[in-house]
Amino acid sequence: SYMVQGVRSARGHGSKLALFQPMFAVEFEGLESSRMQMHRFREVRSGIVLQSLPFDVRKSTIALFMAEVLYRLVKECEPNQRLFDFVWGSVAALDALDEGVANFHLWFLANLSRLLGFRPGNDYTPGAWFDIREGSFTPLRPSHGEMLSTDDARILHDLLECDVRYIAEIGLNRRQRVAYLDALLVYYGYHLDAIHAVQSVRILQEVF
């Protein structure tokens, strides 16, 4: 953990506080101390110059959700370059996105499953269900109740295969987005109980 001194100071080039918002990417040089649990920043600066995310309430709401999901679910301390690259790229993609913003949190959750180890394990075929227990698409309705419907399974497939720049082409209305988010959270919850502690889901459902 690192401590930032003078975060609210208005001296110099402005307050550092503006850099520490949900999902803002920063680069920093730190000073580690063997005598203290909290290390210190020597220098901190913006890693990605964000053009729209700080000013768009839809994007900032999604960023809050992304930050909480990662905080709740990612507990590893060792470096994970693939996960870092995905998150870094996701922030840049969200900032650059003009259309399809309302689908972005769904795309993020679907593709984050790849990095967390429970991406669907086989190919999708039209009309398939998704068996949450097995983590795979199936042409037959599972006998247990832990599954995604054929509609939700198709959306999961579309989100996994879609380039983030084209997520507007996945046509979902508000009711469908709410229902699919609930379904995706059930899938996550089967693998990671901590997803149920994410509070920003309610805000997402109000905005989208």
Q: Which ranges hold each PLM region?
A:
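Non-catalytic alpha-helical scaffolds and adjoining flexible linkers that form interface surfaces
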Residues: S1-F208
